[in-house]
Amino acid sequence: MNILVIGNGFDLAHRLPTKYVDFLEMIQCFKSITNEPNIMKAGGLDNIEKPIYAFLDRFIFEECALRGEFNKLIEDNFWIEYFLQCPMYQKENWIDFESEISNVIQSIDFDMKNNNLKLDDGASIVSNFYLEKFFLKRLSAAELGFGQDLHVSTFREMRDVLYQDLNKLIRAFEIYLCEYVENIDHMKISKEINSLGIDHVLSFNYSHTYQKLYDKSKNIKYDYIHGESRLNNTIESNNMVLGIDEYLNKKS
């Protein structure tokens, strides 16, 4: 049996925009367009030469239901705001989602342990600047009479908001992969890969690139180790996994 193990390098070798920075750049373009009244009123983009703009022109102006879902997923999402403000992303146009998520979780764990606080104690001490800024903004909105359900007063509530926003982020990434990445049709087939005679694919990707380009027989078995992207999923049914480092020791 010939088994092929693939990771994100496989998609990148086929020139697919599957890096996290590609996803963030799409979000920035999406926000710029949907927040511009004149463009929305015009009902379309004037320049769609770049593939991402051709996609957004269709996605925003023709697929209103999906656009609405996507907008709700990314709106006031802590993780998206955090990643976009991350110094590494702003300076070097690179980011590691898993590492940054781990950093935020560790900062909360540190705040609680260092100050002898528990989950149901008030989150009055927050050492992470971006975390404090984000929840202060939500608190200000609640005090003004907007979004009362967004008020966060305990570490437990903070944890729950971060978890909900993480699930929203993953679902938004799933839509990006299904609607944009998997509909790119100018990928080149590798003769070397095509001649391997693969029986089983173990994929650490969420996408279906090998299946789309090389599986002509439809007899190949697939295992998606970190889950796979499906457009008809919901936040609840999505099975894509974003992993983080195990930083707690056995005594913790």
At which residue positions do the language-model features occur?
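Extended, H/D-rich, highly charged conserved domains that either
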Residues: 40-252
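An N-terminal structural lobe/cap that precedes and organizes the functional/catalytic core
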Residues: 1-51
